[in-house]
Amino acid sequence: MITPEKRTLDEPEVGSESKKPNNSTHVKGVAAIKAEYLVPTSSLTVVEYDDDEAEGGDREGESKPRNKKKQKGQNHKRDLKQKKDIIKLCPSLIDPEDDRICQVGADKCRFHHDIASYLESKPQDIDGICPVFEALGYCPTGIKCRWLKSHYNPETSKLIKDGDKMETAKTTNYEVNHIDKDQKMEMQKKKYFFKISQPVIKYLDSRIQNEANLAKQKEERKDNEASYVEAPFTIAEKKKLYLRNAKIVSPLTTVGNLPYRRLMKTLGADVTYSEMALSVPLIQGHNPEWALPKAHVSEYPGFGVQIASSKHWAAAKAAEAIYRNTTHVSELNLNCGCPIDLLYKQGQGSALLDQPSKLLRILSGMNASSGDIPVTVKIRTGIKEGKNTAVNLVSRVLEEGNAAAITLHGRSRQQRYSKEADWNYIAEVGTVVKNWNEQQKEDKEGRDRDPVYFVGNGDVYSHEDWYEHVNTDGIDSVMVARGALIKPWIFEEVEAQQYLDKSSSERLDILGKFAKYAIEHWGSDEYGVGLSRRFMCEFLSFTHRYIPVGIMERLPPKLNERPPKWVGRNDLETLLASTDYKDWIKITEMFLGKATDDFQFTPKHKSNAYENK
């Protein structure tokens, strides 16, 4: 849980090894690993990572490349579909003791109704105790569970249930932000009444009339202002955010799923965000989009929902829909930083950086429609490399946007991850925010609202990075993205103010915890296990990049340094560092049982070789 007061930060005690002068020779851009762990090779065979994939690359509709070039970077044509049961059991029979009745009858039902033959057709149970039963005291997937023998009595043909554990789980272990089916159906049928955002949209529409009709525009604006209904909550009355020195995990597409975020909460994170949701599918009631605001109860308070939009009307409606249909949301975050071409061409994400008036209308619409949920924004330094625009943009957001917090990723859209984040520029923007906050304290009208938080983002991979930036004047906290994927215990290091040389068994335990959370979330049946395995492989596509600090020749480690081929201090450490996705599948089998022959997983990243010059 986040507390309003954070402890005073002292200068971290940096390990002596990071202060030692490095007299050894190493190749620039290549991680410095102790010689005894290097594998002799004539060239450096490494993996080229396209880390923009975590910022929206899995969204449907990604445009296909026009010309066929040598394939490298991310795999756009990955087959991500997971297989379901060959024989599909009728949902009414999942729990033999349940009184549910098949609505169409056994004769007409397209699902299987013979429990005995269904059980015979199932693959052999996975060894061990069902993670869901162990956590909740019962298993919602019933006899479809792949660990069925751990909670099924074949003599009585009944499921085993632990009443005490079930009662405890009701208050400590459950998921939140489930939208009501009827409300979602109304959105799908376009019958949902957006009572809060409708007058807001009408008012904002009046602000974008053609300037050629200025006189007419003024009259219309007067009419709209007369009919405009004030938002039920002013900025000062919205929920409070506590981001000063908070340990923040960045919004991440695909890998920033609920099990991962839940894992990060156990490893010290204060604030987590949903994967990016698109505003139009949200207000149309699309099931996949409404799965994104779901969270584990442990994430709240401190859970934010991130949305992307190119239209103020869509953003306002999405903000209202989230406010009225969720219960555990601490903030709404507008994505103005996603560099992916699909969103950019649609005017979403980083496209808004060059359209400040549109961005401000979207923020205004969200703020007026989001009830007591504060609105925040995440931006980049600009669109093009060398042409930073964040200072001017942030100045306007402070004056007109009513954002509760601003996060700046220290790269332009054009740069992507090709260069290191510009923390000098982040600090420059932080000074702008700090000065504005100080002016607000002197302003009578500004005294009623809380200061705007400013958060920096980019290349944070150690406690040294974190403290260096948090102790920079004007920067309230730091948001961590790739660093928290490759090294999930990064916030434990921040708390301890030292490097933690996690053993291979400790790292495996972290992966095991993710696997349990994944099964709890996606289910313990064949389909749920397949999904859990797929997302665990996605997670491993980042964790395998970790180089143990105990084998490094110099510290601190850098995210953009490529690792040469190396071996670990034991076989498990070597396995956890494998770049072969087949080894990732082997690791999942330690927790999820043997993968089926038809399990499909294609890594996002393709291998590339570099000459060691």
Swiss-Prot record:
EC number from the UniProt entry: 1.3.1.89, 1.3.1.-
SUPFAM superfamilies found in the cross-reference section: FMN-linked oxidoreductases (SSF51395)
- Record's compositionally biased regions (Basic and acidic residues): 1-20, 56-65
Which stretches are zinc fingers (C3H1-type)? 90-113, 130-151
Positions bound to FMN: 251-253, 306, 378, 409, 457-459, 481-482
Cofactors named for this entry? FMN
Q: Where does the protein principally reside?
A: cytoplasm
Query: What's an example GO cellular component term for this entry?
Result: nuclear periphery
Keywords in UniProt for this one? Cytoplasm, Flavoprotein, FMN, Metal-binding, mRNA processing, NAD, NADP, Nucleus, Oxidoreductase, Repeat, tRNA processing, Zinc, Zinc-finger
Residues in the active site? Answer: 338 (proton donor)
Q: Where does this polypeptide localize? A: Cytoplasm; Nucleus
Question: What family name appears in the similarity comment?
Answer: Belongs to the Dus family. Dus3 subfamily.
Q: What is this protein called?
A: tRNA-dihydrouridine(47) synthase [NAD(P)(+)]
State the species of origin.
Candida albicans (strain SC5314 / ATCC MYA-2876)
